């Protein structure tokens, strides 16, 4: 072990004696060449403090890594990345796509299965019309052109999770085409993409989900067919994305849109939505590549990364695959069209199989399912009933009615499938009714105050307890009454937080009753009491008082305010009044 460390040129401390690089032989020297040297202490000229030497080595290593990173980054700038996204989302329906079996996947394995789901001979598909409605809502929300006539096709492949040997999808004539999604800087797109990017959507198609497989090494694999024929929509974007961050932002935005219109069950975090990404690179300034995808020409050979289950995985996998392809091309290699995988925490993608083409899947129209005909009257009704889109909600929340910062508005929209936003609106409505007697300026700020309590104070308690969102834990009326008391200065901020935690822990008493019974209502101090308390704190810290007076260090007044709140009776000292008295006594 010692020989290998010496050979690598890296010093290690194996005993209390401090050895230096100069006291060791060169990497090429053998132990037998100078056996007595290891028994001699280093000379004063050779002696270097170990801590200093380690710092120098660490500094040199950081410098080397920085130079290498800058060199690699310069090389990366020579290449253009192109990404297309495919999203598979489970539709929120009670029945499966082509059978009457229920769609619940949390039941006992293989308990919600029809004969057609298992491909029993003679069983026929029965298209469940209710599955079309959430799919249409998603297509309308994504600005798609709904096709009056669409058809189903068979995509043939053989795998244990697909008992029929084919998947029913809409390859040739999908039900929706030519949509788009707009991404803004607040969506998290890359700075180099500017303030806004429009990503075109090629098509939306209905298709079956597959069985859920669970592997038990070395040779056992269990299959749960409850998920077979669960209705999916596949959203296919055009290959117009050129940065990993924007690709992740696109997936995030698409999820937010299909969730906001009630089309899907859950998002990525719960397994209801999966993303595949197609990645290719080409050198800038060179002749256009020879590949074309979805009508866009001049691209490099693409690879597909399957089943990405988080936004971070989307971004990280694209970065890793981009770097891999560049390294292959710069070393004179050729990119193969293939399907690759990505594991969380990994630094590189891995090959799964060669990439199949449409010929390999042997697409053919399904002869057992008639064409799907969609009337304009149905579309008109759905458009009228569609909820407000996320971008419109954001505009509303940051506008004059609510005046929220964008940092608060976005989480309210995105958290808990819209449940947090609904809760927030209820709190604001109740709070405004309680504060109807207040002036306009006070009432105008209520929405921002409420967002702080819903997101940060209540959200913090949920995070600390590792608890999922539940609107009943702290009823909207309780939170509104608590904020009302705080705004009227009937309680202090610390008291309000204490009461919120009490309600969160299960106290169901109405807020006014709780405050009265626990003696938490603010009993304001008189001016004389404030002065006496301030004088006692000042007397204990004469040096700090002198610094405030002579050096104008007004920031230290806040420290005195804190001392007054700590030493005074709990919940009775108001910070603004305490600071006012301190300024009078210290500054005159």
Swiss-Prot record:
Keywords attached to this entry: ATP-binding, Ligase, Mitochondrion, Nucleotide-binding, Protein biosynthesis, Transit peptide
Kinase is among the record's keywords: no
EC number(s) stated in the UniProt entry for this protein: 6.3.5.-
Superkingdom of this protein's organism: Eukaryota
GO terms of molecular function: ATP binding; glutaminyl-tRNA synthase (glutamine-hydrolyzing) activity
Chief location bin: mitochondrion
Bias-annotated ranges (Low complexity): 22-35
Subcellular location: Mitochondrion
GO biological-process terms attached to the record: glutaminyl-tRNAGln biosynthesis via transamidation; mitochondrial translation
A GO CC term attached to the entry: mitochondrion
Quaternary assembly: Subunit of the heterotrimeric GatCAB amidotransferase (AdT) complex, composed of A, B and C subunits.
Name this polypeptide is given: Glutamyl-tRNA(Gln) amidotransferase subunit B, mitochondrial
Organism from which the protein derives: Penicillium rubens (strain ATCC 28089 / DSM 1075 / NRRL 1951 / Wisconsin 54-1255)
């Amino acid at each position: 072990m010692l020989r290998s460390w010496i050979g690598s040129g890296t010093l290690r401390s194996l005993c209390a004696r401090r050895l230096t690089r100069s006291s060791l032989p060169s990497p090429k020297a053998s132990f037998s060449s100078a056996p007595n040297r290891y028994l001699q202490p280093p000379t004063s000229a050779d002696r270097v403090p170990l801590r200093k030497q380690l710092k120098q080595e660490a500094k040199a290593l950081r410098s080397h890594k920085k130079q290498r990173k800058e060199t690699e980054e310069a090389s990366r700038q020579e290449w253009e990345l192109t990404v297309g996204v495919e999203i598979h989302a489970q539709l929120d329906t009670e029945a499966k796509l082509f059978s009457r079996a229920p769609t619940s996947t949390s039941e006992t394995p293989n308990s919600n299965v029809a004969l057609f789901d298992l491909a029993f001979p003679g069983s026929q598909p029965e298209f469940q019309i209710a599955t079309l409605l959430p799919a249409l809502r998603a297509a309308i929300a994504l600005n798609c052109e709904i096709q009056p006539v669409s058809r189903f096709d068979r995509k043939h492949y053989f795998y244990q999770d697909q008992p029929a040997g084919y998947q029913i999808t809409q390859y040739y004539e999908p039900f929706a085409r030519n949509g788009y999604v707009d991404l803004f800087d607040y969506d998290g797109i890359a700075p180099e993409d500017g303030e806004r990017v429009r990503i075109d959507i090629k098509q939306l198609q209905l298709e079956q989900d597959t069985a859920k497989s669970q592997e038990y090494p070395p040779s056992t694999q269990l299959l749960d067919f409850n998920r077979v024929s669960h209705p999916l929509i596949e959203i296919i974007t055009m290959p117009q994305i050129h940065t990993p961050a924007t690709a992740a932002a696109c997936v995030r935005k698409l999820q937010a849109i299909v969730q906001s219109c009630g089309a899907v069950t859950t998002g990525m975090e719960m397994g209801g939505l999966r993303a595949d990404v197609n990645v290719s690179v080409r050198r800038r300034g060179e002749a256009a590549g020879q590949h074309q995808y979805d009508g866009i020409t001049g691209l490099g050979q693409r690879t597909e990364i399957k089943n990405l289950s988080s936004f971070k995985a989307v971004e990280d996998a694209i970065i890793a695959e981009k770097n891999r392809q560049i390294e292959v091309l710069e070393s004179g290699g050729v990119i193969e069209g293939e399907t690759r995988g990505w594991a969380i925490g990994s630094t590189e993608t891995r090959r799964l199989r060669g990439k199949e083409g449409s010929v390999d899947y042997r697409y053919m129209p399904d002869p057992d399912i008639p064409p799907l005909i969609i009337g304009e009257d149905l579309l008109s009704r759905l458009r009228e009933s569609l909820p407000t889109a996320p971008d419109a909600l954001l505009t509303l929340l940051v506008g004059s009615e609510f005046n929220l910062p964008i940092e608060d508005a976005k989480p309210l929209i995105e958290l808990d499938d819209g449940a947090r936003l609904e809760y927030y609106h209820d709190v604001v409505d109740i709070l405004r009714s309680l504060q109807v007697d207040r002036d306009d300026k006070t009432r105008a700020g209520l929405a921002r105050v409420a967002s702080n309590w819903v997101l940060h104070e209540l959200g913090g308690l949920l995070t600390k307890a590792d608890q999922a969102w539940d609107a009943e834990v702290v009823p909207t009326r309780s939170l509104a009454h608590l904020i009302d008391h705080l705004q009227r200065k009937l309680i202090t901020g610390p008291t309000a937080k204490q009461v919120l935690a009490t309600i969160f822990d299960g106290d169901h008493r109405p807020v006014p009753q709780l405050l009265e019974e626990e003696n938490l209502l603010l009993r304001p101090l008189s001016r004389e009491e404030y002065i006496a308390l301030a004088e006692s704190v000042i007397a204990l810290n004469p040096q700090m008082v002198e610094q405030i007076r002579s050096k104008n260090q007004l920031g230290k007044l806040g420290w005195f305010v804190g001392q007054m709140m700590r030493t005074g009776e709990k919940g009775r000292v108001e910070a603004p009044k305490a600071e006012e008295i301190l300024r009078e006594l210290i500054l005159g």
